[in-house]
Amino acid sequence: MAIISLSYKYLERLTGTDRETILKRLPMIGSEVERLEEDHADVEFFPNRPDLFSVEGAARAMRGFLGIETGLPRYMVKPSGIRFTIDSKLAAIRPCLASAVIRNVSFDDESILSVMALQEALHWAVGRGRSKVAIGIHDLDTITPPFHYVASPRVRKFVPLDFTDELTLDGILEKHPKGRDYAKIVKDFPLFPLIVDNEDHVCSFPPIINGERTRVTTATKNILLDVTGTDQRAVNVAANIICTALAEAGATIESVEINGAPFPDLAPAVRTVSVRECSALIGVDLTAPQMAELLEKMRFGAEPAGPDQVRVQVPCYRADIMHDWDLFEDVAIAYGYENFAVEVPPTFSIGKEHPANRIAGQARAILAGLGYLEMMPFTLTNERVLCDRMQRPGEPATLRLMHPISEEYTVVRTDIVPLLLEMLQVNRHRELPQRLFATGDVIADLLTTQRLAFVSTHAGADFSEAYAHADAVLRELGVAYSAEVSDDAAFIEGRRADIIVGGKKAGVFGEIHPAVLTAFELEQPVAAFELDLRAVPGYPSP
């Protein structure tokens, strides 16, 4: 969840109404007011709505929701005449780029803070900590077009933001705070991505830091926006959100030609949806004109296209609209959840804890007592993490997504240990020892089962630790088991064992293989364990 600081003064200016009305209705569009201060409110927005991560975006949504200004916001984009080229050597490093020229900005301290907060929130929500998307905002009047996105030698020097002296690119990774934070994204490449102007001045070292030359201040009037990354759709989404937020503040947007194609594309997407399906889903009988009116409150363009159809124009910044039901959810929000009739269920029953949840809770308590910290890794992952890095063959039983929107999430997990190793990778610069565990569902052969897994990393982590902690967990859960030699290539030969319960394999434990550690960029040994919780006495049959 992203917590955004909304200035009352700026919010009132952009919405045209008072703060009391805004704060009362703001939670109804998908937010929670965390804290009220004298001059601002800290508001938590759901991560599926990154377009709300700024005062400008929140004000745009509230104007529609309050009926002040409804319908599709239209953003004019005219050509800037500025070109961008992309070095072909970046194809294997960071190949994707979007850009725009934003003119006539009027910055004060509040609006600069809003834009910078939006930038960082997008790095988190869309950019996966800058690895997938990174955003650069530059004072256009300090540099000379055309611009070039190049693969540069690591010895290239420039003055990074907030510094006064030149550093090499390697030096920035070592000495600049942002360099240390994000070095892991680029450090293994022989060349580094740079954005330079026509006079070879460095604008940006994405995804690390901008140059001091292009610093944005209250005197800045014209902006060059660059968005780089590894996923073009995500890059375009971030660019559209930044551009439209600044347009809401009164700026004008101009396109940049990137290898012959104009960016950004702020045209709406068009969908035609069923009124009958929407009414059945939300439980409210609507006509096509009524549904169109509700959608316009949520800042869509909408018009009836027949008695059972509405033609919807989806704003370019609404990256969360991927299915008709996403639109139906917005219809329900506009209708007002407080207006839905309350119905008492016709039958009465008494609930109790499901046995599977009871056993999982018991397992969590045991591992917490052993000093492990609970994680909640995603259910979706990819075969690089699940198979390649673990030295395991791809499994036909793996459930694959037909239309993944990202190469990071293409399959449903069949094991939990690989995802815990990925979490150790993210936290490898933190203090040791690190002991993590997770419980949750895995799917193989279309069968959903619940697993328990743990990993422990420190200089002394070994098979003995894995065995001791596995034995403690199994005994506390009342599992009668035996250990047999395992052939799992993810573990070191001779330091791995299968958990056998009732003559069947129910899990595995051991010391992770050095090749797997290298694949996850881990420098210390790792002890690991995974158990199918169906082996625990009292676990319910499917």
Curated annotation (Swiss-Prot):
It is found in: Cytoplasm. GO terms for molecular function: ATP binding; magnesium ion binding; phenylalanine-tRNA ligase activity; RNA binding. PROSITE patterns: B5 (PS51483). It is an enzyme of class 6 (ligase). Its EC number is 6.1.1.20. GO terms for biological process: phenylalanyl-tRNA aminoacylation. It catalyses: tRNA(Phe) + L-phenylalanine + ATP = L-phenylalanyl-tRNA(Phe) + AMP + diphosphate + H(+). Keywords: Aminoacyl-tRNA synthetase, ATP-binding, Cytoplasm, Ligase, Magnesium, Metal-binding, Nucleotide-binding, Protein biosynthesis. The keyword Nuclease does not apply. The keyword Magnesium applies. It comes from the Archaea. Residues 266-342 form the B5 domain. Its cofactor is Mg(2+). HAMAP family: Phe_tRNA_synth_beta2 (MF_00284). Tetramer of two alpha and two beta subunits. Belongs to the phenylalanyl-tRNA synthetase beta subunit family. Type 2 subfamily. This is Phenylalanine--tRNA ligase beta subunit. It comes from Methanoregula boonei (strain DSM 21154 / JCM 14090 / 6A8). The gene is pheT.
